[in-house]
Amino acid sequence: MPKKNDKTAGGKRDQLIDTALRLFARHGYRATGIDTILAEAGVAKMTLYHHFKSKDELIVAALRRRDADWRAWFMGRVAKRAATPRERLFAVFDVLEEWFRNQDYHGCSFGQAASEFRDPKHAVHKMASEHKQQMLGYFRELAAAAGAKDPELLAKQMDLLVEGAIIHMEVFREPEVARIADDAAQKLVDEALS
């Protein structure tokens, strides 16, 4: 699981975001009340509303932090594991398995947010969608760099494998599902690059 970005350390705002992220991951967004966040963070309600107009605004800020930290961690790990663009397509699944095996794994914050805030116009849903679009764009970049005939198609296929592995992990708690997704990706990548 990615570590908190050093640039965000300190301050009551960051303390609220850090606490909220931890509680949302464990209990969900709607089930986690403001009073619980305040008690865990050791922060007064006035301080919360000084930094955030609403719980939804806190959720969006927490997801923005999670997005930046997660993508930096994930993409950095992929880059370290693979030397070539083609190898990076498969390193995605190595890093996915690494994440699944982490003791702090609590599933996808963004999938959970989208499922709890179903209205696509809601700020929380939009933030979740933005993250998913960023990841799809990353897969598109990897596919194009590897020489895929149709980078958009390969990116969507990779995304489906990743998202499917995440859901499988959520339900069955089998980290090795990342290896199965990797096997499927091998076939798709071979076809896309031929």
Language model: regions and residue ranges:
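N-terminal intrinsically disordered/low-complexity leader segments
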Residues: M1-G11, L193-S194
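Helix-turn-helix
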Residues: P2, Q15, T19-E57, A61
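Hydrophobic/aromatic-rich alpha-helical bundle segments in the mid-to-C-terminal region
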Residues: K4, V124-E130, A144-L193
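An amphipathic alpha-helix signature
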Residues: I17, F90, Q133-L136, R140, ...
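Hydrophobic alpha-helical connector segments
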Residues: A61, M75-N102, A145, P151, ...
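Short, basic, alpha-helical segments at the C-terminal edge of helix-turn-helix-like DNA-binding modules
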Residues: R64-W70
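Short, solvent-exposed amphipathic helices
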Residues: W73-G76, A123-Q134, Y138-E141
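Amphipathic alpha-helical segments used for helix-helix packing
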Residues: E87-R88, N102-A123
